Amino acid sequence: MTTRITARFTELAAEGRPGLVTFITAGDPDYDTALSILRGLPEAGADVIEVGIPFTDPMADGPAIQAAGLRALKGGQTLAKTLDMVRAFRDENDTTPVVLMGYYNPIYIYGVPRFIADAKAAGVDGLIVVDLPPEEDNELCLPALDAGLDFIRLATPTTDEKRLPAVLAHTAGFVYYVSITGITGSATPDANAVAGAVARIKQHTTLPVAVGFGVKTPAQAAAIAAGADGVVVGSALVEAVRKTLDEDGKATVNTVPAVTALVQELAEAVRGVNRAAAE
């Protein structure tokens, strides 16, 4: 069965353009505002959406996404409510792929079989669980794949030729290439180095490769997208939320428009990249 993720990247390849993958934190700064942002992303130009599951100890995330997670948790966001958000989104949109991104602990506490069943029923298409290595595939990856959920793995600049086959073995949907060593939203990736890394990964897989971590501006997104099948932007969108909050950390009338406006700028830049010309 073709997942929404595979279908979307097939469409993008046929159009000869890279995709824009956007990340938001579920429940940031509150459930209703986050749902409004989620619903506005496709029209603004997001091709694939990652929804972050808030967690108290997000080791791979930088200050922006850590703060967003804490805002969401303070507002009462849970894994169950995150699935509710996706379900509500699916009431209006049945085509845009949604990937849940987070850490294993909340899923483990929720219960793996229950989580897989509920995620599938809610309309989730894929999972990125950053702290589950390939050696733990039996925990979540293989059951998720059996249920028809794509399991997306991270490859990094330190993933060498010996390690890469293990990383790719059960990866489905796309490969997420982490363009920098470190946490999200920190350094700025080098477009030429990224293009070389993507080419190296593609020697081992036919899956599309999306690149994230450190991509903040439309110009950076376009430069990275020229050498990849997709570019992921997260910290910049989360920061757009933060900058519009009032002194109590609550959403304002500017919160949703600020995020969708930035996504429109990013999408315009990424859609201006012609993959055929770049290759």
Curated annotation (Swiss-Prot):
EC numbers for this chain: 4.2.1.20
Keyword Acyltransferase applies: no
Pfam families referenced in this protein's UniProt entry, alphabetically: Trp_syntA
Catalysis performed (reactions): (1S,2R)-1-C-(indol-3-yl)glycerol 3-phosphate + L-serine = D-glyceraldehyde 3-phosphate + L-tryptophan + H2O
Enzyme class: lyase
GO CC annotations, alphabetized: cytosol
Key words, A-Z: Amino-acid biosynthesis, Aromatic amino acid biosynthesis, Lyase, Tryptophan biosynthesis
Top-level taxon: Bacteria
Pathway, per record: Amino-acid biosynthesis; L-tryptophan biosynthesis; L-tryptophan from chorismate: step 5/5
Any one GO MF annotation of this record: tryptophan synthase activity
Annotated active site: E50, D61
Record function comment: The alpha subunit is responsible for the aldol cleavage of indoleglycerol phosphate to indole and glyceraldehyde 3-phosphate.
Quaternary structure and partners: Tetramer of two alpha and two beta chains.
Family according to the record: Belongs to the TrpA family.
Protein name as catalogued: Tryptophan synthase alpha chain
Highest classification ranks of the organism: Bacteria, Pseudomonadati, Pseudomonadota, Alphaproteobacteria, Hyphomicrobiales
